[in-house]
Regions:
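Conserved SAM/SAH cofactor-binding pocket of Class I
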Residues: 56-107
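Class I SAM-dependent transferase core
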Residues: 2-3, 7-67, 73, 105
């Protein structure tokens, strides 16, 4: 079965503008993220739908409610979810915070 990333209408513009980086992060989660224990073993489509798309919905809300000037903190980031996808499409600093140093070093 071939993995093909898809995006709901609310995220199509950002997806098209940042597709390569988002897919690269997805692939990193699927390989390194699973291997190092940042995320549990999941199918590629699940990782895309549940981690990437859901993360980008936060970006959609940031735009919708005009929170662009606010600082963003991802508490308990684990594998960088939702912080990394948000920072990819938002092109701004997202503070990734986790209580396990190994997770932060891996990111």
């Amino acid at each position: 079965m071939t993995f093909e990333p898809q995006m709901p209408n609310w995220g199509l513009i950002e997806f098209e503008q940042h597709k390569e980086k988002l897919v690269n992060y997805h692939d990193w989660l699927y390989t390194t993220g699973i291997k190092t224990g940042l995320i549990s073993k999941k199918p590629k489509q699940f990782i895309w739908d549940e981690f990437i798309v859901h993360s980008l919905y936060f970006h959609h809300l940031i735009k919708k409610y005009n929170f662009k000037s606010k600082e963003i903190y991802d508490l308990g980031t684990g594998g960088g979810i939702p912080g990394v996808p948000i920072s990819i499409v938002n092109k701004r600093k997202v503070n990734l915070i986790d209580n396990k140093k190994t997770r932060i070093y891996e990111l």
